[in-house]
Curated annotation (Swiss-Prot):
Primary site of residence: membrane
Chain positions recorded as Zn(2+) binding sites: C895, C897, C906, H907
Protein name, per record: Protein translocase subunit SecA
Reaction(s) the record says it catalyses: ATP + H2O + cellular proteinSide 1 = ADP + phosphate + cellular proteinSide 2
Membrane topology per record: Peripheral membrane protein
InterPro entries xref list: Helicase_ATP-bd, Helicase_C-like, P-loop_NTPase, SEC_C_motif, SecA, SecA_CS, SecA_DEAD, SecA_motor_DEAD
Source organism superkingdom: Bacteria
Textual note on the cofactor: May bind 1 zinc ion per subunit.
Organism: Teredinibacter turnerae (strain ATCC 39867 / T7901)
One Pfam family of this chain: SecA_PP_bind
């Protein structure tokens, strides 16, 4: 109550921000008469002037009014588009490192030019982030004339681009690209073996278009560069044949025992599956019968846990992942569908063997599992930028998450014209059949009035079902879903024509507007050399169609079901009512819809029974709509908790990632690392000596023979340590360390002399390669640790604290191994001829090409804890740490050198 009173008197925080920015807008408007008389050369020269003033100490905030006035003038001349005042407010919001919520059709692409130009003045580069290659290319080419009129360069980054082209694009003042490409290029740069192979400059400023899609919907999907690992396709196929033998146990009412027993249970809210006691027994019998498990073996023996993991993956593939809902089969491949956008995601794969299980289910080629070489998340990648901003049509519902995770405030920008769309209350039916009948009836009615209709669906399957029913009803229509995405631009261009009916999944219109009457530009583009008369006729025809649609009440939106997120529903509604156009939106729901069935059905059914509803009748009341929104908020809260949990775990890996990547960059920049190599060599010698000659010990406790053998085996160096001691009875451990260090330094110096100046380059290359190999192993070990860490909760330990502690231990071990491995390699390296070197390089390139490095935007398999986030007790993991070449020795195992000591006190110890 007090909060409402305060807002009534002082206005909301958003109102106060808009008022503050309004003063800046007036300053920019006042400068317009100064910039209009400038010729093109003088306008372009303004950029050099601004840069000079910036270098002399003026801040970007001080330059803002003039820079925005210059950008507005350039847009007027180059594009014939003048920024509205609300667009200037959007630009100020972006410059200040916040999120601008701007409704559909308000010109977000043009708004970005203001902040991009101002932040391009320091010359550090500005990245504008889009959701797909098409938009990256389109926006770069569309806005290029504005930037070039101001003397700035523009580049675009797309997939499958030549590295030289990418370097050129990143060197531009303004770079457009997709979130995936920026992230992958960051990882590639941190795998480069030469500094000239890197593409990105330090990350200064980014404007993220559709920021909710990228920073929230994509937050849980890690970017992974991987290489092929072992092939388990035969096992996946064998397990897939067993799955149909397992029967689902029906869900019992809360607090009651199940009336019918089955082999597994499904928790639809958590999207998880667990085997029952009967299920475990049957699975063991089936595995033994098919020769996958020994007669006397237990499924729960450590060596067989991978089989249980495969069974659970197979069950989830069959019962939680449905064709044409979560994925489609295209060109013999399982291609995932983004639940938020409805678009296909080629190249993205489910983790933990789930994708392979789906491939086995669908009978397509099973791709080998992969081994991670580098990875990050969008959450951590975008937080590297010095300044981050974003824009979208729907951000306010997620304002808390943007603030918590990214430190970004949301500013709701007013529309240039008031929104005239009518958002009607939901209609709720008892059954899906009743709902579809009502939709068909209303589509017919709207068509009869010449109103264009957009029917929004949540899946490919629903869109195809709606299409079938419309066809049966004799209603002509277009379908836009993941299968027809090639025709997206054409379908959207015609969706606003009088009486047009378009069925679309969530993919409809991200980055494109449905223009009432259809897009006249699309008609002109189809003509090869249109004459002035043809263009005039097309425009005249469009005006007539436009008027017809306006009279019919604009675009009519029909939502066939509610999404888990209110934001996705708002995006569908936002397709209508652009730039003050009329429009109408309504959702048609049934108690059999997923969201209603899982989260809201009991309450809804009680309401409907109280009202005495019958088949075919619908309920329409604000109270019901509020109840549905409450269910959505519950789901959104749960999803936020999972994303936050993911970030807390990834932050641990991210701290280590930053250390390793900073070390790599120092290495790449350094011309000579001889001093660092010398320090590492001294550390390794001291550690080896300490393992065999314990500090403050007597000579009888020294294992000189073991040390001599280790130096010979590991470093190829024969050192007469015993002879030194026999010749000098006064030599203590310090004297031995000094002499051993001197001798090892001499041996290394002779090797350097034999190899020549190339040794300095070789040292750097070898250190990079050893670091990369160990980092790759470390990522696998971290993943294995993460998969089982939640089980520590059963021992009354905090899993997050345990993860931090153990991951730090793993990281320390990795740094120790780096010193040992590098020293071993450097002492064993032999001088070779130029011809041998060329042959080795040729072989290395051939091997690299055959290694099939993959770029994966790996989809964690749902929001459930057991999929890529926190495993449940019912689903043990099969993942094992990456095994290094040769025998892997545990820290507490006997050292393989034969000393009789534990490995951690011998070769595994570093002083």
């Amino acid at each position: 109550m007090i909060g409402k009173l305060f807002r009534a008197v002082f206005g909301s925080k958003n109102d106060r921000e808009l008022k503050r920015m309004g003063k800046l807008v007036r300053k920019i408007n006042a400068l317009e008469p100064e910039f209009e008389p400038l010729d093109d050369t003088q306008l372009k020269a303004k950029t050099a002037e601004f840069r000079e003033r910036f270098n002399n100490g003026e801040s970007l905030d001080q330059l803002l009014p003039e820079a925005f006035a210059a950008a507005r003038e350039a847009s007027k001349r180059a594009m014939g588009m003048r920024h509205f005042d609300v667009q200037l407010i959007g630009g100020i919001t972006l410059h200040e490192g916040r999120i601008a919520e701007m409704k559909t059709g308000e010109g977000k692409t043009l708004v970005a030019t203001l902040a991009a130009y101002l932040n391009g003045i320091p010359g550090k580069g500005v990245h504008i982030v889009t959701v797909n290659d098409y938009l990256a290319r389109r926006d770069a080419n569309w806005m290029r004339p504005v930037y070039e009129a101001l003397g700035m360069t523009v580049g675009s980054i797309v997939s499958m681009q030549d590295p030289a082209e990418k370097r050129e694009a990143y060197a531009a003042d303004i770079t457009y690209g997709t979130n995936n490409e920026y992230g992958f290029d960051y990882l590639r740069d941190n795998m480069a073996l030469r500094k000239e192979d890197r593409m990105q400059r330090p990350l200064a400023y980014a404007v993220v278009d559709e920021v909710d899609s990228i920073l929230i919907d994509e937050a849980r999907t890690p970017l992974i560069i991987s290489g092929a690992a072992e092939d388990s396709s035969v096992l996946y196929q064998a397990i897939n044949k067993l799955i149909p033998s397992l029967k689902r146990q029906p869900e019992a009412p809360e607090g009651e025992e199940p009336t019918e027993l089955g082999h597994f249970t499904i928790d639809e809210k958590m999207r998880s599956i667990e085997l029952t006691e009967d299920g475990h027994q049957l699975v063991e019998e089936l595995l033994i019968k098919n020769g996958l498990l020994g007669e006397n073996d237990s499924l729960y023996h450590a060596s067989n846990l991978s089989l249980l993991h495969h069974i659970l993956s197979g069950l989830r593939a069959h019962h939680l992942y449905h064709k044409n809902v979560e994925y489609i089969v295209q060109n013999g491949q399982v291609v995932l569908i983004d639940e938020h956008t409805g678009r296909t995601m080629p190249g993205r794969r489910l983790s933990e063997g789930l994708h392979q299980a789906i491939e086995a289910k669908e009978g397509v080629a099973i791709q080998a599992e992969s081994q991670t070489m580098a990875s990050t998340t969008f959450q951590n990648y975008f937080r590297i930028y010095d300044k981050l901003a974003g824009m979208t049509g729907t951000a306010d519902t997620e304002a808390f998450e943007f603030r918590q995770i990214y430190g970004l405030d949301v500013v709701v920008i007013p529309t240039n014209r008031p929104v005239a769309r009518k958002d009607l209350n939901d209609l709720i039916f008892l059954s899906v059949e009743d709902k579809y009948d009502a939709i068909i009836e209303d589509v017919n009615e709207f068509r009869g009035k010449n109103a264009p209709v957009l029917v929004g669906t949540a899946s490919v399957e629903t869109s195809e079902e709606m299409s079938k029913r419309l066809t049966e009803a004799g209603i002509a229509h277009e379908v836009l879903n993941a299968k027809q995405h090639e025709r997206e631009a054409d379908i959207i261009a015609q969706a606003g024509r009088p009486g047009a009916v378009t069925i679309a999944t969530n993919m409809a219109g991200r980055g494109t507007d449905i223009v009432l009457g259809g897009k006249w530009q699309a008609e002109i583009d189809k003509l090869e050399n249109p004459t002035e008369e043809q263009i005039a006729a097309i425009k005249e025809d469009w005006k007539k169609r436009h008027e017809i649609v306006l009279e019919a009440g604009g675009l009519h939106i029909i939502g066939t079901e509610r999404h888990e997120s209110r934001r996705i529903d708002n995006q569908l509604r936002g397709r209508a009512g652009r730039q003050g156009d009329p429009g109408l939106s309504r959702f048609y729901l049934s108690l059999e819809d997923n969201l209603m069935r899982i989260f809201a059905s009991d309450r809804m059914r009680a309401i409907m029974q109280t009202l005495g509803m019958e088949k075919g009748e619908a309920i329409e009341h604000r109270m019901v709509t509020n109840a549905i929104e409450k269910a959505q908020r519950k789901v959104e809260g749960r999803n936020f908790d999972y994303r936050k949990q993911l970030l807390e775990y990834d932050d641990v890996a991210n701290d280590q990632r930053r250390v390793v990547y900073a070390q790599r960059n120092e290495l790449l920049e350094a011309d000579d690392i001889e001093e660092a190599i010398h320090g590492i060599r001294e550390d390794v010698i001291a550690a080896q000596l300490e393992s065999f000659v314990p500090p403050q010990s007597v000579e009888e406790q020294w294992d000189i023979k073991g040390l001599e053998q280790t130096l010979l085996n590991d470093y190829g160096v024969s050192v007469p340590l015993q002879q030194w001691l026999d010749e000098d009875s006064k030599m203590d451990e310090e004297g031995l360390r000094t002499k051993l260090t001197e001798v090892m330094d001499e041996i290394y110096a002779r090797k350097c002399e034999a190899i020549g100046s190339a040794m300095r380059t070789l040292e750097k290359q070898l250190m990079l390669q050893v670091l990369d190999t160990l980092w790759k192993e470390h990522l696998q070990n971290m993943d294995a640790l993460r998969q089982g860490i939640n089980l520590r909760a059963y021992a009354q330990r905090n899993p997050k604290q345990e993860y931090k502690r153990e991951s730090f231990t793993l990281f320390e071990e990795m740094l120790q191994n780096l010193k040992f491995d590098l020293t071993r390699v450097l002492f064993r390296v032999q001088p070779i001829s130029e011809e041998q070197l060329a042959e080795m390089e040729r072989r290395r390139q051939a091997e690299a090409a055959a290694r099939k490095i993959q770029l994966q935007h790996e989809q964690v398999s749902g929001l459930e804890p057991e999929a890529g986030e926190a495993p449940s007790a019912g689903e043990p993991r099969s993942e094992q740490p990456y095994v290094r070449a040769g025998r892997k020795v545990g820290r507490n195992d006997p050292c393989p050198c034969g000393s009789g000591k534990k490995f951690k006190a011998c070769h595994g110890k570093l002083g």
